[in-house]
Structure formats: C-alpha cells, structure tokens
Amino acid sequence: DNFLDPFNIINILRSIAIVTVIAIGVSISLTIGGFDLSVGSTASLANALVISLFVWHGLGTTEAILITLALCTLVGLFNAFLIVVLRIPDMLATLASLFVIQGVAMTYSYGGSITENMVLPSGEMAEGTIPAAFGALGQVPTIVIIMLVVTLIAQLALSFTTHGRRMYAIGGNPEAARLSGLRITRYKVAAYVIASLLAGLGGILLASRIGSSQVNAGGGYLMDAVAAAWIGFSLAGSGKPNALGTLVGAVILGVLSNGLVMLSVPYYAMDIIKGLVLAGALALTYFQRRT
C-alpha cells in the first residue's frame, strides 16, 4: 500500500478532524493555565443527544445541533463553577466532571446505543430518522472543511485579538494579570465553555460520521486530543498553546497511527507508541520552559 496515495491522505484527514476539533478546546483551556479532562465525556454526551433528538424526537438538523451545543455549554459552566467558585484545581475538577458527564450520557441513553428503528424502553419502535444533510457533515470534504475553519478561527482569535492576548497573559502569570486589572474569572469561564462547545461539536461530527450513538463513543478521543494539544504546544506552538500547533499535533498522531497500521503493528500496541510520543513532547515542553 502506498502511504502517499490520495485515498490514504483523505483517510488520514478524515480520521484527525474530530480529534483536532476536540483538541483545540483542550488548547484553549491550556491558554488560561487550565486543563480540561472532560472533553471526551462531553463528546459522548453530544453524540447521544444529537442522535436522540433525531431518532426519539424527530427534530431537524439545525434544531438538533443547536440544542446539543446549548446543552454542552452547561458542561463548561459546571466546570467553571467547580474551578472558579469552589476553587478546585482544574485537573481534579474536570476529572470529577468527566465521570459525572459520562454517567449522565450513559443514563440518558439507558446504557446502550441509540440507532434508527431501535426499540425504546417503552417497547415502542423509534420512528425518527437521521437527516441526510446531517450525515453529510461527517463525510469528506465537509468534515475536513469544518476542522480547518475551526482551526483558523481559533488561531486568529488567540493570536490577533485582545481577548486572545489576555488569555495568554492569564495563563502565563495569573497574579500579574490580576494586578493589571484583567477579569480572570470571566476569561476562565469563557475558556471552559468554549472547550465544552468544541467537544460538543466533535461529538456531533462523530455522530454524523458513524450514524448512531455508541456508549462512551467520545471517551477514546480524550487522550488523542490531549496528546495533540501538547505535541502542538511543544513542537509547533512557539512555547504556548495554539490552534495551528494543535492541528500539527493531530496530523502527527494521524500519520503515526496510519503508518503503524500499514506496518501491521497490532492495534493494542499503538497506545504504547502514542504514549512515548506524548512523553517526549511533554519533556520537550518543560525543557523549553526551564531554558
């Protein structure tokens, strides 16, 4: 098989699109000195919500997507409440949130998959269908275009707007940012809401791609998203988290995974390679900070 075959390149781009969107949310939480571990569970929740709105309630594409994204903002507000109001450290707060949201998603979906023509707990048959327009979102080129648009908007917002520079200032030195009059609380809330929105968008794209809701479908994207964010931070981020670097990190992971498959490396060994790459990226990041 030829690695540079156009179909293989398209497959890589399709495979990294969801990871990239979720990882940019992680990167935005990193800009303010935080860290969001709940993005995988949020993606799972969005996956279940959007499919259920089609299959159980018969809503259209636009309504289902908007309702799902609106509900995902509640996850960001919940994270912000734990971190800003209760002052729980970011990683511990979002770890707790990970389990809460995962439980909510499992409970909402009755612990199973949501598909067309499924049998409801009441014994009736679900009559709703997934619109063709929604299914197109998860296909090439639409999913790749969405990934690139999200990357571009996030990169421009972080690099060329006052709010982006303020977020970097808060992440770099919170005390100095506070003394200079920046509203740290407001930016922390915004960062976690945006991270949850992007995780929700990732879950929606996943739902479009697979055409159903699977139990904890977004959970597998957490570590890849974290790895992409940190790899981009260290290798292509100029010493700070950014969307373009995150895209580069996702591409590196996508190429690595694709190459391992072509080399017939067992799937259960791939996490070892990814873990070593992430460890190297983290080591490089902290080495750069010390120097």
Show the residue positions of the predicted features.
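Hydrophobic core segments of alpha-helical transmembrane domains in multi-pass membrane transport
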Residues: 25-26, 98-105, 146-156, 195-202, ...
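Transmembrane alpha-helical segments in multi-pass inner-membrane proteins
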Residues: 199, 209-275
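Alpha-helical transmembrane segments within multi-pass membrane transporters and channels
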Residues: 58-99, 248-249
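Helix-loop-helix "hairpin" substructures at the membrane interface of multi-pass membrane proteins
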Residues: 59-68, 74-79, 136-213
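Transmembrane helix-bundle core of multi-pass membrane transporters
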Residues: 90-163, 187-190, 209-218, 269
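Interfacial loop-to-helix junctions that mark the boundaries of transmembrane helices
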Residues: 3-14, 58-63, 131-145, 213-220, ...
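Cytosolic-side transmembrane-helix boundaries in multi-pass membrane proteins
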Residues: 152, 179-186, 256-291
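Single transmembrane alpha-helix segments in multi-pass membrane proteins
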Residues: 1-57, 82-88, 227-243, 276
